[in-house]
Regions:
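Alpha-helical membrane-protein architecture signal
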Residues: 2, 32-36, 64, 68-71, ...
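Generic hydrophobic transmembrane alpha-helix motif, especially the helices
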Residues: 41-77, 84-85
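Short cytoplasmic-facing helical segments at TM-TM junctions of multi-pass membrane proteins
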Residues: 81-123, 151
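C-terminal transmembrane helix and the adjacent membrane-cytosol boundary/short C-terminal tail
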Residues: 30, 87, 122, 164-198
Length: 198
């Protein structure tokens, strides 16, 4: 289980940070968006698990390939939702801040990012679900360790009590991660409490 958590945590961390930066960049700059949009259209419809054989061939280790795919499955929804959040901000907010002498750095850090955070968390929830699926497939096919590998091993040896125990651990792990993300969201967005419907 610790191996699965480490693999998932590293991939989600990389995917979330890169997705947040990418979404913020294309939402703020039309020039950057011009070059990144084709990449989103190309990679968006492709399930990350479909790229597993290619990544296992390219990357020197199955661990690196799995981390990349987990990061990719998180990167796309976080990017799109962050971009949507930045683009959906009322332009009047920027105008008021500029009237008060706000710099571009202030507009990004104190206006754009806080206003886009609810969308960012929606992307995080979507990315976490997708990344968990990629984790299990990667452990079954490439990594050969962790919960996914144990589940496949138990099924192959007809050890059905072990298999159902692995499924229960998977369900509890996913539920715990989602609950933790809800707690983090409620803590960071306490100033919007009462205005969120999810």
């Amino acid at each position: 289980r610790s191996h699965s958590l480490g693999l998932l945590g590293l991939g989600v961390l990389l995917g979330t940070s890169s997705g947040f930066i990418t979404g913020l960049a294309i939402g703020w700059s039309q020039r950057i968006g011009y070059w990144v949009h084709p990449v989103l259209r190309l990679l968006g419809p492709v399930p990350s698990t479909a790229l597993l054989p290619l990544c296992l061939f390219i990357f020197p280790s199955s661990f690196g390939a799995s981390v990349f795919l987990i990061a990719l499955s998180t990167w796309f929804p976080v990017t799109v939702l962050t971009w949507s959040g930045v683009m959906g901000i009322d332009k009047a907010w920027y105008d008021v801040a500029r009237t008060l002498g706000a710099s571009q750095r202030f507009l990004i850090l104190r206006v754009a990012i806080p206003a886009a955070l609810p969308n960012v968390f929606v992307g995080l929830f979507m990315g976490l679900g997708a990344s968990f699926s990629v984790l299990i497939v990667a452990e079954m096919v490439g990594v050969k360790s962790g919960i996914g590998f144990y589940l496949q091993w138990a099924q192959g040896w007809a050890a059905y009590p072990n298999m159902y125990a692995a499924l229960l651990v998977m369900a509890l792990l996913c539920s715990g991660l989602i609950s933790g993300l809800f707690m983090l969201r409620d803590r960071l967005l306490s100033w919007q409490r009462g205005g969120m419907q999810w």
